[in-house]
Amino acid sequence: IYKTSKISESCINPHKNWHDVEEQYFNSPKQIIYIDNFLSDEAVKELRAFCLVSKVWNREYENKYLGAFSDRGFISPIHLQIAINLKQKLPKLFGQHKLGKFWAFKYDSTLGKGINIHADFAIHNLNFWITPDEYNNEKNAGGLKVYDAPAPEDWTFHKYNNINADEISKFLNDNNAHCTNIPYKFNRAVLFNSAYFHETDKINFTEGYESRRINITYLFGNRLVKKKN
């Protein structure tokens, strides 16, 4: 495990007006925004070093990407400080919601594709990218596609997280869901309603260990599930 250096100030960008970010989210008609220059330069450098050096990528998925999880080694003082700083700087968004799970995925686009369409069990989903832009071969792609129709409250986690993609597509079509496609950018965060269905956009990154696309996800709060009678 890479031992991260202590960050001298906030892990999230200390020069950004975070009150404006909160207002942008609350005024967004779809609860989908992106935040450029999300982490401080110091924090993103250390977090990237942690991801490159630490042997925490211990789960392989069908689409050939790897996962690392907070309860299986993907954790450091920086990981936790990011959550603390989010609560401090964006109290209206995160203050009342407990940090749930957080994880990272690493993709080799020569082997497979990204994550299939799904939703997550939380209130807010914060997803950010830490692989430098120089490795992304398609500058207007490689990011995240978010559909502005939340998973039904009476669907179980297994149903909206592992369901057949055809059934989700039918649900989105029936509900006239619009897709917001946020292109990949280094140190860009995407914040959205975690009940929204989302999937990885087409990825095309340069071959090589350091060039693999890495995204990190933090979940805040618990989504209410409607009990069946």
What positions do the PLM features span?
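Fe(II)/2-oxoglutarate oxygenase catalytic core
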Residues: 1-189, 195-229
